[in-house]
Amino acid sequence: AQETSPDAGQLLKRVRQGATLQENKDIKGQIRKRSVKIPFSMSLRGNLIAFQYQLNNVWNRFDLKFKDRGQEILSWKDGKAGVLPVAQYAVPIAGTDVTYEDLSMRYLYWPQAKIVRDDAASTVKGRDCWIVQIPNPNSGVGQYAWVRVWIDKENGAMWQVDGIDRRGELAKRFMIDSVMKLKDGSWFFKRMKVDVRDPSNPRRTVSVSYVDMDSPE
């Protein structure tokens, strides 16, 4: 008998809760590319998630703000927040392969997610996963026309994200190397590999970064 698919939106909600459940507490980590290490933190503050990263001993802040319809990214300068131009969503942070859009994971909040059946590709790291496909509601904004997210059928952890460009080609792959269990029983990634593909040959990796998360205190 074929198993019944859960609601794709509910699956994404569980993944999002893993990132934001530590309300008003910072989740800390670092972005690595070769010898470059960029410390960062993220925390839920009311209707936004605040991100901070350290470059040349200076902390920089940007926020993912939730509105009635959709989200926007705010950038802080001289103590004031302004809307980050959408052209900068795809700008790498501090020379890494991780962009503002990537770190904010704004795609997890896009509407119209659906589960796609691809039994041949549904296993990641030996884990049986639901594959959730999410179209970009504004395909002219950011790097991805749509993304695919692999979510563990048993524990709800996210194992892989594929960012697909406007040509339908794989632009970037986020692979979860390891996960950690949080105090509320949910799962969140401990290490994520960011794999940038060659636009002329999407099977070829041209650059790699890592995102390492500290265990919440």
Language-model features, listed with the residues they occupy:
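N-terminal mature ectodomain segment of secretory-pathway/periplasmic proteins
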Residues: 3-78
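Flexible, processing/modification-adjacent segments and terminal tails
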Residues: 3-14, 20-21, 66-145, 166-168
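Intrinsically disordered, low-complexity segments enriched in polar/charged residues with Gly/Pro
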Residues: 28-30, 38, 49-53, 59-62, ...
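Intrinsic-disorder/low-complexity loop/linker signature
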Residues: 29, 35, 47, 57, ...
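Short, surface-exposed beta-strand/loop "edge" segments at domain boundaries and coil↔beta transitions
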Residues: 35-40, 56-64, 78-85, 139-144, ...
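Short, exposed beta-strand/loop patches in secreted or surface proteins that constitute
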Residues: 39-45, 63-66, 113-122, 177-180
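Short, surface-exposed linear segments at secondary-structure transitions and domain or protein termini
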Residues: 46-52, 69-74, 91-101, 181-187, ...
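Gly/Pro-enriched, hydrophobic low-complexity segments
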Residues: 125-217
